[in-house]
Design a protein with these regions (language model features):
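Glycine-rich, highly charged phosphate/nucleotide-binding loops
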Residues: 1-3, 53-83
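Conserved beta-strand elements of the Class I
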Residues: 17-20
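NAD(P)-binding Rossmann-fold cofactor-contacting core
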Residues: 23-27, 35-54
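A short helix->loop->beta-strand "cap" motif at the edges of active sites that frequently abuts
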Residues: 40-42, 92-97, 115-117
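Short, charged, surface-exposed secondary-structure boundary motifs
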Residues: 54-57, 71, 107-110, 128-134
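Mid-chain, well-packed structural core segment of small domains
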Residues: 70-106
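Rossmann-fold NAD(P)-binding glycine/threonine-rich loop
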Residues: 101-126
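Conserved anion/nucleotide-ligand pocket segment
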Residues: 140-156
Length: 156
């Protein structure tokens, strides 16, 4: 998905983000992307069976065990691991399946879309939020990929 308006709408409407594969290690990309989103008003729910709590929130072993509503499922796992996560996202009634930079499972995205979810692949929620809502700066992960440019106008 490359449509700026759709990405902006997804990030504006999503308030609860379940991060699958979130690490408790501060230096991991999943941690600082989740921390950034939390600091920008999103509720971040951790999904990782290794931990009890991350970023002050209870950590769940799977998406299906999260009580309450999840708007966006953010996937920090290998491409091969995405299909069962997509199935869980469908089962819990999430609105968006978001695959992070380097994660691009077309079959999982197609399955999510067929079930009525929106699907984003190979993009970082932190980078897109910063780019689309005015927070893009020099802090981030050196992926050796320039994946984002400032839009011509900002939605303030």
């Amino acid at each position: 998905m490359d449509d700026i308006n759709t990405l902006r709408r997804i990030l504006r409407e999503s308030r609860v983000i379940a991060v699958v594969g979130l690490s408790a290690d501060w230096y991991r990309p999943s941690y600082f992307a989740a921390k950034y989103m939390q600091e920008h008003g999103y509720r971040v729910v951790s999904v990782n069976p290794k931990y009890g709590e991350i970023l002050g929130e209870k950590c769940y072993p799977s998406l299906r065990e999260i009580p309450g509503k999840v708007d966006l499922v953010d996937v920090f796992r290998k491409t091969a691991d995405v299909m069962p996560i997509a199935e869980d996202a469908i089962a819990i009634g999430a609105k968006v399946l978001w695959q992070q930079l380097g994660v691009k499972n077309e079959a999982a995205a197609a399955k999510a879309r067929a079930a009525g979810l929106e699907a984003v692949m190979d993009r970082c929620v932190k980078i897109e939020h910063g780019r689309l809502f005015g927070g893009l700066n020099w802090v981030g992960v050196n992926t050796h990929i320039i994946s984002a440019k400032r839009p011509r106008w900002l939605a303030y």
